[in-house]
């Protein structure tokens, strides 16, 4: 990872789905700028595509349905346990 504008920053990228998604482009750019990332996806099927992408840039991948308050809470708890406080979403 190069040291860029996001060096030592921790971020969340929501909605990673595949290598053509906007979220993937954002994750790649943030990683290239030095960020540590958590990427979310929705559902097991999407996770089969999203998790390897996230892993390829050293990011954590978590399943999170943003329409479910309990899922959001669970995801935030997991993020805090892994990265601590987020600097950007």
Question: Which sequence ranges carry the predicted segments?
Answer:
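Short-chain dehydrogenase/reductase
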Residues: 1-88
